[in-house]
């Protein structure tokens, strides 16, 4: 220690030195018991030896050594604190990672639920519209049942209806088939055509044919003229006595439906006006036909 010396005589060598409470060092020769020789203050003194306490020895050690010891202690303290800090940071990092994963999962779930909610709202709106429509007109829900086509029973083509004489000078023999496009029919007319007492017996099989039967209350005698072709031609008939004597009704069957048109009698080929007959002539002709029928049988 280069700095160690007596503050009174400035000696460096010697075996006994004393230090006062006021911070002065004296050798054994310069030491006074009551007052400090330098500052003159009352003080206590302590003999320097190897038995000093640690807090007293540190004042006589080298500052570099003291600094190294302090730095070593500081380094240990710093390493310990840094280790604890690293553990705490690692814990927070792991917790942040878990929280980020939980937040991401929650965001995905929220997006999925929002999409599902939008779909449910859309479906709910459509169902509300349908419900409003059904509340407004409940018959539309069952309307399709009213328009359902019903099956029609049709007899076999082999079955036929036998001809029978009619009280109004007309009879019909109808042979039905399973399709409207293959219905043959025979019309036996008892009308009086061209001043003769002949019965007109017509049989034709158009693609879509049908027969008209005069009502019992009618006084018409119908004469049917089938066309030569199987389809697309008209079947005309005309009344002989009363009613619509000025026109001839032309019935034209086809595959798609029935058409009915009216033409003037003069436009038809071979048109002849009906001949009015008296009740006596009609009766005589009816008896003649009846006799002819019996003979033919």
Swiss-Prot record:
Q: Where in the cell is it found?
A: Chromosome
Instruction: Please report the PTM annotation for this entry.
Output: Autoubiquitinated.
Compositional bias, Low complexity, is annotated for 163-179
Keyword Zinc (UniProt): yes
- CDD domains in UniProt: RING-HC_RNF212B
Q: Which domain of life is it from?
A: Eukaryota
A molecular function (GO) held by this record is: zinc ion binding
Segments forming a coiled coil = 87-136
Q: What class of enzyme is it?
A: transferase
One GO location term (cellular component): synaptonemal complex
Subunit details: Homodimer.
What is the designated name of this protein? E3 ubiquitin-protein ligase RNF212B
């Amino acid at each position: 220690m280069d700095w160690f010396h007596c503050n009174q005589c400035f000696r460096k060598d010697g075996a006994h030195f004393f230090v006062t409470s006021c911070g002065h060092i004296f050798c054994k020769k310069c030491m006074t018991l009551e007052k400090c020789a330098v500052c003159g203050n009352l003080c206590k003194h302590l003999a320097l030896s190897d038995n000093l306490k640690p807090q007293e020895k540190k004042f006589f050690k080298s500052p570099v050594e003291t600094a190294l010891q302090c730095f070593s202690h500081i380094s240990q303290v710093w390493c310990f604190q840094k280790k604890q800090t690293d553990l705490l940071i690692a814990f927070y990092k792991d917790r942040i990672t878990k929280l980020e994963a939980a937040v991401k999962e929650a965001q995905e779930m929220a997006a999925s639920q929002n999409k599902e909610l939008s779909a449910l709202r859309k479906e709910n709106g459509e169902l509300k519209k349908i419900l409003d429509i059904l509340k407004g007109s409940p018959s539309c829900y069952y309307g399709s049942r009213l328009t359902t086509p019903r099956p029609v029973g049709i007899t076999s083509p082999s079955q036929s209806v036998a001809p029978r004489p009619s009280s109004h000078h007309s009879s019909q023999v109808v042979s039905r088939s399973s399709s409207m496009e293959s219905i043959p029919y025979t019309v036996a007319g008892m009308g009086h055509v061209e001043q003769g007492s002949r019965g007109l017996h017509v049989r034709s099989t158009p693609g879509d044919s049908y027969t008209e039967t005069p009502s019992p209350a009618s006084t018409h005698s119908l004469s049917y003229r089938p066309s030569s072709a199987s389809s697309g031609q008209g079947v005309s008939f005309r009344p002989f006595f009363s009613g619509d004597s000025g026109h001839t009704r032309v019935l034209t069957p086809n595959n798609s439906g029935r058409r009915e048109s009216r033409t003037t009698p003069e436009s038809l080929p071979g048109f002849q006006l009906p001949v009015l007959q008296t009740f006596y002539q009609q009766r005589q002709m009816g008896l003649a036909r009846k006799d002819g029928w019996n003979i033919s049988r």
